[in-house]
């Protein structure tokens, strides 16, 4: 929300300085985000170039004589601007002036041997824009000798506040002035709006077919207007807050929107056919809006239509067909009340952001619907002339204020601050609330412009933000001599350790949205009605995510689109299987794209630049589970994963027959097509909350590290097994042959060929043997090897490859 200081003072009688106003705004909850104060431009004056001759020693410089309008002799200025010429009127900086755009304080100096007494400035040097190809060139009637900042209306600071969604009353300059006055920083000026008598009825009638979408509608015809440019003061205010002046009629509606928080719309009455009907839009109905784009409407949107069709998207944007232009002579002024939720949903679905939508979706003051028409009528008559008809009001039955029972003691109970009863009631009264009664519990009537206030806690908040939250005395946090229990829960510890484990593996942590498109949710097992948002922040963020993978895959693709195709990302966060509290899961997930392997990415002379695959994802998943405390040696890997993985290049990690701890693999081509991404791409998900809790054991000191004094030995074995035998089964069989001596088993080769026989394959393993009590003899190694072969043969049917 932007406004100028002079605009604020139209509604607030105050002698407070800009700094005091800014400080007070923030202290009462209207956080100031930025102040554009051009006070540094006060020393710059409008000056006229009398002569411009070539510099004697520089081809690109000119020597100017400049009249600064101070009644003294013209000054000499050396200038390099290509547009410097006799007769030009621009902005002049005298010696001693600080020029913000170049961060220099001017002095009298010589430029290539010629003295220069000041500077003719460009827009960039005054920080007005990036334009620096020439000095500022003002109109011929610009008053020489006067302040440039005053002439260009740069001496009126622009204040921007960052509004929270619960403050619709502060979407107007008047509402902000009301808050400042309530805080004691000035007096609020009268808000009375003159009632303009009309001549005859407004011939266009209004029919409301959807009262649930439009509880009130006011319409007024003004005949004989002249729609030209708006006056300079109005244009300057709109420009200051970032709006583009269009015409007097349109500028009036924009002005009232910001001045009083009342969005309006104007129709060219000659372009309206028949009466106006407020109804639900028909499915597939189209309208060309004022932004020049055609929009397709749906039945959950509200439209204003006539015999020609839709003339306006209610509460969001008007239609081009009935818009006002320079030929408009008869105008219909519309002021209506629109359902906030419908307005917000319509704007999000169509992708339209307007100042009207911003206010209607937060809630406007219903009691200012008719006064808004009167205010706009007065401005139209003053700026465009014309003759008004009577105002047509349909549907609005008046505002019935809500009454809240307010115990005065709530202020102390909720804040710990003793605010006198009289002060509390006085603050509420200054804010427009109406306390009734004098006991310790008073009934408070809520003002029509505060739909955000609902109960007694809200009233306490209103009292405290005006009384001053800085009056709450700081309290130190309680200190404990010792912590007798765990600070973090098991799930929190697992989340932290999983993040560390994945980061160590070269993956970067990402934080993605919990909301994803419905199409993506369905690809990953979601899409249930219970997981659809009632009020999504965007049309493509409609479902709670059933998996972390869609967000991570999309993030990896965005990196690839920007030239970073080899990327490894992970996230540890929540997923949703339903809307129950017990249906939210804690998941660690990750994706690798391109050649982003554990040992590096990109092309290399060492030849490690192959694409990522299923085993990269498997290793990541196992590492995450191990960090979470899962018994890795007991995990079972089953071929095949959920439908979003490639059926032949994916797997499921289980602990026992029923407990699924994770999935991993390369993604199915249809999944990648549905997400509109490219590969190579693999990923994994492990369910952190599914890892069983370790059994409670008496606390023991960690045993000392005992290292064997004997040399470790490695032996290789190659077994021929059926193709259906998994490598993991063979590895576990080899490990079980002697758990005391065998410390590790790893697969280093898999071979299939006709020489092995039909449906056979060879798996080669490396067995690490660590003697503990003595150096093993050849006979010991032979006996151990025999046990390995026997155990593998017993559990897998494998035989040593000859």
Curated annotation (Swiss-Prot):
Gene of this entry: pheT
Protein name in the entry: Phenylalanine--tRNA ligase beta subunit
Subunit (UniProt): Tetramer of two alpha and two beta subunits.
Domain tRNA-binding: 38-149
GO MF annotation list: ATP binding; magnesium ion binding; phenylalanine-tRNA ligase activity; tRNA binding
InterPro entries: aa-tRNA-synth_II/BPL/LPL, B3/B4_tRNA-bd, DNA-bd_dom_put_sf, Fdx_antiC-bd, Fdx_antiC-bd_sf, NA-bd_OB-fold, Phe-tRNA-ligase_IIc_bsu, Phe-tRNA-ligase_IIc_bsu_bact
Cofactor: Mg(2+)
Gene3D superfamilies registered for this protein in UniProt: 3.30.56.10, Bira Bifunctional Protein, Domain 2, Ferrodoxin-fold anticodon-binding domain, Nucleic acid-binding proteins, Phenylalanyl-trna Synthetase, Chain B, domain 3
Source species taxonomy: Bacteria, Pseudomonadati, Pseudomonadota, Alphaproteobacteria, Hyphomicrobiales
Keywords: Aminoacyl-tRNA synthetase, ATP-binding, Cytoplasm, Ligase, Magnesium, Metal-binding, Nucleotide-binding, Protein biosynthesis, RNA-binding, tRNA-binding
UniProt binding sites for Mg(2+): 452, 458, 461-462
EC number: 6.1.1.20
Gene Ontology BP annotations: phenylalanyl-tRNA aminoacylation
Residues annotated as domain B5: 399-474
Heme in keyword set: no
Organism: Mesorhizobium japonicum (strain LMG 29417 / CECT 9101 / MAFF 303099) (Mesorhizobium loti (strain MAFF 303099))
């Amino acid at each position: 929300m932007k406004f100028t200081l002079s605009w604020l003072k139209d509604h607030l009688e105050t002698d407070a300085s800009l700094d005091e106003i800014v400080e007070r705004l923030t202290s009462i909850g209207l956080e100031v985000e930025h102040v554009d104060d051009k006070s540094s431009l006060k020393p710059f004056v409008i000056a006229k170039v009398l002569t411009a001759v070539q510099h004697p020693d520089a081809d690109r410089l000119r020597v100017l004589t400049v009249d600064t309008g101070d009644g003294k002799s013209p000054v000499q200025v050396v200038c390099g601007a290509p547009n410097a010429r006799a007769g030009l009127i621009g902005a002049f900086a005298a010696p001693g002036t600080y020029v913000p755009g170049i961060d220099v304080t001017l002095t009298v100096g010589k430029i290539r041997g010629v003295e220069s007494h000041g500077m003719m400035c460009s827009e960039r040097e005054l920080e007005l824009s990036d334009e620096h190809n020439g000095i500022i060139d003002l109109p011929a009637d610009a008053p020489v000798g006067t302040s440039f900042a005053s002439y260009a209306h740069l001496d009126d600071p622009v204040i921007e506040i960052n509004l929270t969604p619960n403050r619709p009353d502060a979407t107007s300059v008047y509402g902000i002035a009301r808050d400042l006055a309530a805080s004691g920083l000035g007096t609020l000026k009268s808000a009375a709006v003159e009632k303009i008598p009309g001549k005859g009825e407004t011939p266009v009638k209004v029919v409301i077919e959807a009262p649930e979408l439009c509880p009130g509608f006011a319409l007024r015809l003004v005949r004989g207007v002249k729609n030209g440019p708006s006056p300079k003061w109005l244009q300057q205010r709109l420009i200051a807050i970032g709006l583009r002046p269009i015409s007097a009629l349109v500028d009036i509606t924009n002005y009232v929107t910001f001045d009083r928080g009342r969005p309006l719309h104007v129709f060219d009455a000659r372009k309206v056919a028949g009466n106006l009907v407020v109804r639900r839009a028909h499915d597939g109905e189209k309208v060309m809006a004022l932004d020049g784009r055609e929009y397709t409407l749906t039945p959950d949107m509200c439209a204003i239509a006539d015999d020609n069709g839709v003339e306006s998207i209610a509460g969001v944007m008007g239609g081009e067909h009935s818009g006002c232009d320079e030929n408009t002579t008869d105008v219909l002024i519309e002021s209506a009340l629109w359902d906030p939720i419908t307005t917000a949903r319509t704007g999000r679905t169509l992708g339209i952001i307007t100042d009207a939508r911003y206010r209607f979706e937060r809630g406007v003051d219903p009691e200012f619907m008719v006064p808004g028409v009167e205010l706009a009528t007065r401005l139209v008559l003053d700026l465009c002339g014309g003759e008004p008809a009577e105002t047509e009001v349909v549907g609005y039955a008046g505002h019935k204020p809500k009454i809240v029972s307010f115990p005065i003691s709530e202020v102390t109970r909720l804040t710990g601050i003793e605010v006198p009863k009289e002060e509390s009631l006085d603050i509420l009264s200054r804010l427009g609330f109406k306390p009734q009664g004098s006991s310790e519990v008073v009934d408070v009537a809520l003002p029509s412009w505060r739909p955000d206030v609902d109960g007694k806690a809200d009233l306490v908040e209103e009292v405290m933000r005006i009384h001053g939250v800085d009056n709450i005395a700081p309290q130190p946090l309680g200190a404990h001599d010792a912590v007798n229990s765990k600070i973090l829960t098991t799930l929190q510890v697992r989340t932290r350790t999983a993040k560390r484990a994945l980061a160590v593996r070269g993956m970067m942590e990402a934080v993605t949205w919990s909301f994803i498109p419905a199409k993506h949710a369905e690809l990953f097992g979601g899409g249930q009605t219970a997981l659809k948002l009632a009020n999504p922040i965007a049309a493509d963020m409609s479902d709670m995510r059933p998996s972390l993978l869609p967000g991570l895959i999309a993030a990896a693709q965005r990196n690839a689109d920007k030239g970073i195709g080899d990327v490894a990302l992970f996230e540890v966060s929540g997923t949703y299987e339903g809307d129950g509290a017990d249906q939210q899961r804690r998941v660690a997930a990750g994706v690798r794209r391109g050649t982003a392997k554990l040992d590096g990415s990109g092309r290399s002379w060492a030849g490690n630049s192959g694409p990522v695959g299923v085993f990269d994802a498997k290793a990541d998943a196992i590492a995450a589970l191990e960090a979470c405390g899962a018994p890795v040696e007991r995990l079972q890997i089953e071929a095949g994963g959920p439908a979003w993985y490639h059926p032949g290049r994916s797997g499921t990690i289980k602990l026992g027959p029923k407990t699924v701890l994770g999935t991993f693999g390369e993604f199915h081509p249809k999944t990648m097509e549905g997400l509109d991404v490219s590969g190579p791409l693999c990923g994994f998900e492990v369910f952190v909350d599914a890892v069983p809790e370790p059994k409670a054991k008496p606390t023991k000191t960690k045993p000392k590290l005992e290292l064997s004094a004997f040399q470790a030995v490695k032996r290789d074995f190659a077994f021929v097994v059926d193709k259906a035998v998994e490598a993991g089964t063979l590895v576990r069989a080899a490990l079980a042959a002697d758990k005391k001596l065998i410390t590790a088993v790893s697969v280093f080769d898999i071979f299939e060929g006709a020489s092995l026989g039909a449906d056979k394959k060879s798996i080669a393993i490396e067995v690490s043997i660590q003697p503990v009590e003595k150096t093993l003899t050849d006979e010991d190694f032979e006996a151990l090897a025999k046990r390995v072969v026997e155990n593998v043969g017993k559990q897998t049917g494998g035989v040593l490859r000859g």
